[in-house]
Every structure is written in C-alpha cells, then in structure tokens.
Amino acid sequence: MIKKIDGTQLHTFVLSTWHFMIHLKQRLAEDQINIRAGHLAYVTLLSLVPMVAVTMSMLSAFPVFSGIRGQIEGFIYNNFLPAAGDTVQVYINEFVSNASKGTAVGIAALMVVAIMLISAIDKALNNIWRTTEKRSMVVSFSMYWMVLTLGPVLMGASLVATSYVVSLKVFNGSDLSGVVPVLVERLPMFFSVATFLLIYMVVPNIKVKFFHALLGAIVAALLFEFGKKGFAIYLTKFPTYEAIYGALATIPILFMWVYLSWIIVLLGAEITAAMPEYLDKRQSGKDEESEKKAEAHDPQISFSISTAVNESKKENRQ
C-alpha cells in the first residue's frame, strides 16, 4: 500500500527548500558568478585549441584509441557545442593541425596555456568554497598534469568500453536489445553527472561530502542538457547572430555557449558549497531554540545545553 504523505513533513520540506533557496540567492549575489563565468569563458576560448591539441596528442599516444578519434571528436562537439558543433569542429581541427606543426617551444607554450585554464577553474571553485589554504606548487602542478593526461585517456576508455558493450552479440535479439540504445542515448547525461561530480569532489581544497557534490552535479547536468537543447532551438528559430555577423557568427555563438556553460558549472558548485552551510545554520537555529525553551523551564538546564553546544562547536573547528 502507498503511504499517505504527511502534511507536516511536506510543509517542513517545502519550507526548508525555500530557506535554502534564499541562502543560495544571497550566496550567488556575494560571489557574482556571472562575472566569474565571463572570466572563465574568456580563458576557455584562449585555451580551447591548446586543450584540444593536448587531448588529441594524449589519445594518439595510445594505439588502442587510434580508431575512435573521430568518435571522440564527434561526441565532444555534438554534446558540448550545440548547433554550431560541426562548424567549430572544422575550424578547431585546422587550428590544432597547424599547432602540431610548431616547434618544441611552441608546444610547451600550448601546454602552459592549457594549464592556465585548469588553474583558473581551480581558483574560481576554491573561492566559492571560501577556502583560505592553498595547495603547494608541487601538488597543484601534479593535479593539473593528471587532468591533462588522464582526462583524455579516461574519456577514450569509456567510449571504447561503450562501443564494445553495444557490439556484443549477447544483446542482439534479446530482451535487452531495446535497453542498450536507451542507455547509449543517456550516455551524455551520465558523462555530465560524472564530470561535474568529479570536479566538485576533487577541485576544492576542502572535504566535500559525496551527497552534496552529487546533488550539485545532478542539478548542473540537468541544466546543461536542457541548456543544450534550448540553445540549439534558439539558434535554429532565431538566427539573429547569423543575420548580423554572417560567416563570423560562430565566434559570438561559441562565446555565448561557453559563458552559459560556466554559469551552469558555477551554479552547481554554489549549490554544493551552500548545502553544508545551510545545514549548519539550521542546526544552530535548532540549538538556540532548544536553549531558549530550556531556559524558560530551568536555567540550570539552559546552562548545561549552552556549554555542550559551545564544546561541540569547538571540536568541529578543531
């Protein structure tokens, strides 16, 4: 039997959600994520070609990925650059091809620019978490290098595994044959959740609870998927940029999408960082309310509760 929804619990949930939204709104106003997103969008466009060049270089170093480079490129451009993906892919591949012909000094410069992007992301997210302790140069460089090297490899490995599973004969003609296309269709969503979850768990120089990071990752992934579809519809139905800029329309379109993407990433980070703050604030309010009720009945009990709460806060700080 389906249990009836308790009106008190529903009221408490709605009220808590509303209070959390108020807290989140205050946080967004303080952090000015629109300005930070603009900065990250600028750095991303500056680092886009170096990042793609480094990614493709890493994939070419592993023979197992040689046959799926086109798949990986198509997956990235189709799922992360709506509507203008084909045009952007042509230009970026041409730029990457030119960059790969450069000298060792030029390639090293590309690596530095790519690391600049990761460093900017690191600083932006740690500012959201209000972290004051900075990582050492060795730890930071190791983390950035791991992202540059392992990121493309993990992406390629996931696509290889997916292609292998789909091609298995056990799925052909079985009851699961209809499930596989659905799973493949949902792959971008799963990939988005996993990517955001990894960012929110690893990048902040502070311990982040898995549930909080998962909540922020799911919200960000949903907004990202809806944003892709909405942005593609807007470009198709209202081709304003193409009418104004003509052949150069790809540039403002790409910048707008990158900016919107960073807004979504930072919003998910704000949700993740705001969760423990709100829960601590609510718990503190409950403790104060309990103390006031106890004081009304017995001052001695009030003193005991106050002492216990203060000791608990000191232990948490330590």
From Swiss-Prot:
Ranges of Basic and acidic residues compositional bias?
282-298
Q: How does it sit in the membrane?
A: Multi-pass membrane protein
Domain of life where this protein originates: Bacteria
Start-end of Polar residues biased regions = 301-310
InterPro entries, A to Z = UPF0761_bac (IPR023679), Virul_fac_BrkB (IPR017039)
Q: Which family does it belong to?
A: Belongs to the UPF0761 family.
Source organism of the structure: Shewanella sediminis (strain HAW-EB3)
Quick one: signal sequence residues?
none
Question: What GO cellular component is one of the record's annotations?
Answer: plasma membrane
Give its localization: Cell inner membrane
Q: Which residues form a coiled coil?
A: none
Alphabetically sorted, this entry's keywords are: Cell inner membrane, Cell membrane, Membrane, Transmembrane, Transmembrane helix
Q: What is this protein called?
A: UPF0761 membrane protein Ssed_0302
Regions crossing the membrane: 45-65, 102-122, 137-157, 179-199, 206-226, 247-267
Q: Where is this region: Disordered?
A: 282-318
